[in-house]
A protein has these predicted regions:
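Switch/communication elements of ASCE P-loop NTPase nucleotide-binding domains
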Residues: 6-57, 65, 182-316
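Short secondary-structure boundary/capping segments
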Residues: 87-99, 270-273
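AAA+/P-loop NTPase substrate/partner-engagement loops
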Residues: 52-88
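RecA-like P-loop NTPase motor core
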Residues: 116-152, 245, 262-265, 270-359
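Extended helical coiled-coil dimerization/tether regions that scaffold
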Residues: 1-17, 68, 82-88, 101-203, ...
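Structural signal for conserved beta-strand scaffold positions within catalytic alpha/beta enzyme cores
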Residues: 76, 102-104, 274
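Conserved beta-strand segments of alpha/beta enzyme cores
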Residues: 73, 99-101, 253, 271
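Extended low-complexity acidic/polar segments
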Residues: 40-44, 50, 92-114
Length: 359
């Protein structure tokens, strides 16, 4: 992608910083090139000789391209059924350089097809068993599930019970290898009721975190494409916090492509790139304001600017003001059903109109 070749994005991770700097965000409207950048990053790690984009290590006096083992592994996460990018084959062998793992819907064995729910669940169980049979992974998984419990609906499913079911099943089937297909199928049948009770968003979070815990090592890079497409805001925030603390423990970093201001609330502006497209050229900018903990409405205006003012309820307010009516008349037209934000915007627009200023 020529547009991508002309831009530079810096990602600085500062040790023990508050707030944490191990989650970075690329934000912009649909079609601005965020997913293209992420896919270029995947190619830069998995196939560096045949790609335009490069990762550069800036920790030296003379900057240089990273070595093949700079990242221990790369994990890409995308549950979009419409992304034309075909993920590479998984590469789990550290002797060949950075390992590569994919979390998502694409079926790499059957081009242009998606994985079924039974296939996704079978893959989840395989990685869940991997977490349960290794003490260090089990500790990470338990802690991740506990943190995700800040989302009440997630906690109510009782996913921490899965560990006890695994232990009981292993005790009953002592002669069965836990990594055998037979044991995994048996385990899946025992926990299926838990999985079917999950919403699609909760399933995606559980499957994603479990696979990440299963394969993550020191210095892992995680790339995630638009997680908000499937997650409501509290679950998105819980997921980002959980991921950040998991990466902190293992000296890893995540880069997330998003169009959700909710996600920006979880990261400082030094970790945010606004991506704008002008024709075929991509232009990255840092936000003008601090993003960590900022109001969603403020962040929306910061990122999308005029697009917000000319769309949705802003457009309706503008049209009502252009009709020449008074503030009180417009409130009556809307049967007193305007929120505080809409009323504030309406008042400002009317003041500007009556003074002969542009809105």
């Amino acid at each position: 992608c020529e547009a991508m070749a002309s831009i530079r994005l810096d990602f600085d991770v500062i040790e023990s910083s508050t707030p944490s700097t191990n989650i970075h965000a690329l934000i912009g409207r649909n079609g601005c090139g965020k997913t293209t950048i992420l896919n270029g990053m995947i190619q830069a790690v998995t196939n560096p000789d045949n790609t335009i984009g490069k990762f550069i290590d800036t920790g030296y006096r003379l900057e240089r391209e990273i070595e093949s083992d700079y990242f221990s592994s790369l994990i890409s996460v995308s549950f979009s059924a419409f992304d034309p990018f075909d993920p590479p084959e998984e590469q789990p062998d550290p002797s060949k350089g950075a390992c590569y793992f994919y979390v998502g819907l694409k079926n790499r064995e059957k081009k242009d097809s998606l994985r079924t729910i039974p296939e996704l669940r079978a893959d989840f169980v395989r990685h869940l068993v991997d977490c349960f049979r290794k003490k260090d992974k089990l500790v990470l998984w338990r802690e991740a599930i506990r943190k995700l419990g800040t989302d009440e609906n997630f906690e109510s499913v009782g996913l921490i019970d899965l560990e006890e079911i695994y232990k009981q099943l292993r005790e009953i089937n002592k002669l069965e290898q836990v990594d055998s297909t037979e044991f995994r199928n048996l385990f899946l049948s025992e926990i299926e009721s838990y999985l079917t009770s999950l919403s699609s968003g909760h399933s995606i979070v559980l499957f994603t975190i479990t696979k990440i815990v299963s394969v993550i090592e020191e210095k892992t890079l995680v790339l995630i494409d638009e997680p908000e497409s499937h997650l409501h805001p509290p679950l998105l925030s819980a997921f980002v916090r959980t991921l950040s603390e998991l990466l902190f423990d293992l000296n890893g970093v995540a880069i997330i492509a998003t169009h959700s201001p909710v996600l920006l609330q979880e990261v400082p502006k030094s970790c945010v790139w606004k991506i704008n497209r002008v024709g075929d050229t991509l232009k990255p900018y840092r936000p003008e304001i601090e993003t960590f903990g900022e109001d969603v409405g403020v962040l929306t205006r910061e990122v999308f600017g005029l697009e917000v003012v000319t769309s949705g309820y802003h457009g309706l307010m503008s049209k009502a003001v252009d009709s020449g009516r008074t503030y009180e008349d417009i409130i009556i037209d809307y049967e007193n059903k305007l929120g505080l934000e809409a009323r504030s915007i309406l008042k400002a627009m009317i003041i500007h109109r009556d003074k002969g200023l542009s809105k």
